[in-house]
Each structure stands twice: as C-alpha cells, then as structure tokens.
Amino acid sequence: MTQYNREIFDQVMIQNYVPAQFIPVRGKGSHVWDQQGKDYIDFTSGIAVNSLGHCADEIVDVLKQQSEKLWHSSNWFTSEPTLALATKLVEKTFAERVMFVNSGAEANEAALKLARRYAVDHFGYQKSKIIAFKQSFHGRTLFTVSVGGQAKYSDGFGPKPADIVHVPFNDLAAVQAVMDENTCAVIVEPIQGESGILPASQDFLQGLRELCDQHNALLIFDEVQTGVGRTGYLYAYMKYEVVPDILTSAKALGNGFPIGAMLTTHEIAKSFAPGVHGTTFGGNPLACAVAEKVIDIISAPPFLQKIQRTSEKFMQKLQEINQQCGLFKEIRGEGLLIGAELIEQYHGRASEFVKKAADNGLMILVAGPNVLRFAPALNISEEALALGFERLAKTLHI
C-alpha cells in the first residue's frame, strides 16, 4: 500500500498552495489527528467551514441517509432536499429567492452577474459600475478576483473586467466620491477576512444602504465567511440591522460539504430568467440535505446565544495571554471570527507562529502577514478550548 507523504504533494500537485508538513487523516469535533497519530486542537475550522466540528454525528447521519437515496440529477429537475433548504433560508432571512452553487466564489460571481443584469434590464448598459473595497476578497474567478481589492491576487492574468472601482474600507466619504447613477452595485464584507479581520462600522454599512437607495444600486453582502452563525447571528447583517439586496453564503453552510448560495428578493431574481445563468452541481441533493441540517442546528436561538458566550471567553483568554506575552497590538472581531494583530516588532511573521503552533499541536490561521486568525468550531467544547489555549500560550511564549 502506497504511503502518501508531504513530499508527494510537490511531485504531483500544482504548486499554487504550500500546505503544512503534517497531513491530517482524521477529525472529530475540534480534535484532528495526523498520519503519526499526533493530536491537534483545531482553531481554524477549515477557514470557518467546519462550524459544527469534524464529522459531527448529526451531519454524518444525514449524509449517509441521503447517499442511499439520490446524489445528483442536474437542474433539469429539482429535489426535495433542494426545496427544503431553500424554504428554510427564505423563512429565516430577508430573502424571497435562492440560487445554489458550489462555493463562495461562485455565489459572488452569480451575485455580481445578477446585479449587472438587473441594471441592464431596468436602466440600460451604461449602469455597470461596481464599487468594492481595497483589501477585500470575494473569490478567485477572474470576475470576483478583480472585484476583490488585492492586486497580488488579480494581476498577471491579462485584461480585467471593466467598471470596477476600489475605495478604502469603512470610508463612507470615499464611496460617496465615486458613487453615481451609473453604479449598479456595491459589494462589501461585513467583516473583511483576508485583510486582517476588520469589522465594518454600523454607520458605514448603514451609509452604504442609503447611498445604494439614492442611486438605484444594489447592495451585496458577501457573507461567505461571516454567515451561518460565525458572528453569533445567523447572518451578520442581522447584527447590523442593515438589509442587503443580495447576500452570498458558502463555507459553513455545508460544514465541509461544498455548497454556496445566493439570496435575493423576488423582484431582483426576475433578471435571472431561464438560461441566463446556471451550474451543473449547484443544489445537488447531498449538499442540500447536509446544509438544511446545518441551518436547523445553528439557527436555533440557544445555539447562537452560546456562540456569543464562547466568543466572550475566547476574547478574554486572548487578552489574558497577551498580558503575559505582549505580542498583540489589537484583538478584534465578532463572534468566533477573531483576529489578533501582532505588534510592529513581529510584523510579517504571522506565518511563523502558525508553524510553531502546529508543532505544539494547535491549528491556527493567518489573515495577512501581521494577523493571527482564529475561527474555531462554533460548538467547541470547554475541554478543547482549554487545551487549545494552553498550546497557544506555549506557542506565544517568546
């Protein structure tokens, strides 16, 4: 039997990733084990994906049951799990219509295409400007990576889609300066993830809503990372009490099973008439059965309330550790999406702490070169939390 090790990755895989040296082979809850049987506490959740932990019993049961019924039938047909999930999302959010895809990038691609199509249908081709924010991240398709405000990801692929304008995040005056009647949409993350876990201010998001209303533009919330309970609310827009026209969701929606969704209103959805946009696998029964169970669990008020309590404990513990090590300039975030910015002396070295944490049996993330990112399972146990912080303190002890 072939023993697959990290060196084989370099021999057979395209090198657009540089994975860790250890290979996880099994996970349960917030524990992960590698090929050698070493135990890790997972403070990453697969980048805010496995929000119910690894191999959650309820999710495994649903997946097993659906796997014996129907896997795929294409969008020439619909399915019961697809309709059940769409119904749940409509019941629990502002949305009246849902489209399913396979990832966050696809959800954002669909949202941007819908915004442009809606503008063409109602105002003409000249209304095509998209306003986005510097250091944002919306996916890796040519359209979404161009809308994301990071040249390191978007440069080098030839001409980019036109009529995309980037302005500073949390700067309403900058948006006002470029907003006009040719703007079809503003797309924003309620919390910028890849740039360092930067929450939007209440006034900023409320101001975007008002500007969009004034200029007949659509407001798109990219909740790929903040959605499905991550902030302590089912979706972050509920915390801010600012309702978007289009919302995108993915990551935690499938708890590790690939699925994405675009949510919008009935009126806006009319612009996606039959054949205008599509997907082969979007809304497949396996993914939707899993996601419906995820929504059932996470949307329960006691579950969401516990996330907020766990968030308070997590932030408090980070502050206590920082009082001892003094490595963090700022600790910020919402719910269980938390960033700890390193002091200037350690700028550019966040990835070093990630590697050291792994050596100590802890999985953490970066959010840019200066920020450690924490996104544990929303239902992480007290035992796993305590053990994880013990290993984090060891990691940060200089």
Swiss-Prot record:
Organism superkingdom: Bacteria
Keyword Transferase: yes
Modified residues (N6-(pyridoxal phosphate)lysine): 251
Catalytic activity: N(2)-acetyl-L-ornithine + 2-oxoglutarate = N-acetyl-L-glutamate 5-semialdehyde + L-glutamate
Binding site residues for N(2)-acetyl-L-ornithine: 140, 279
Pathway(s): Amino-acid biosynthesis; L-arginine biosynthesis; N(2)-acetyl-L-ornithine from L-glutamate: step 4/4
Subcellular localization, as worded in the UniProt entry: Cytoplasm
Pfam families in the record: Aminotran_3
Binding sites annotated in the UniProt record for pyridoxal 5'-phosphate: 104-105, 137, 222-225, 280
Gene Ontology terms: cellular component: cytoplasm
Entry annotated with the keyword Cytoplasm: yes
Record key words, sorted: Amino-acid biosynthesis, Aminotransferase, Arginine biosynthesis, Cytoplasm, Pyridoxal phosphate, Transferase
UniProt xrefs under NCBIfam families: arg_catab_astC (TIGR03246), argD (TIGR00707), PRK01278.1 (NF002325), PRK05093.1 (NF003468)
Subunit details: Homodimer.
Family: Belongs to the class-III pyridoxal-phosphate-dependent aminotransferase family. ArgD subfamily.
Miscellaneous information on this protein: May also have succinyldiaminopimelate aminotransferase activity, thus carrying out the corresponding step in lysine biosynthesis.
Name of the protein described by the UniProt record: Acetylornithine aminotransferase
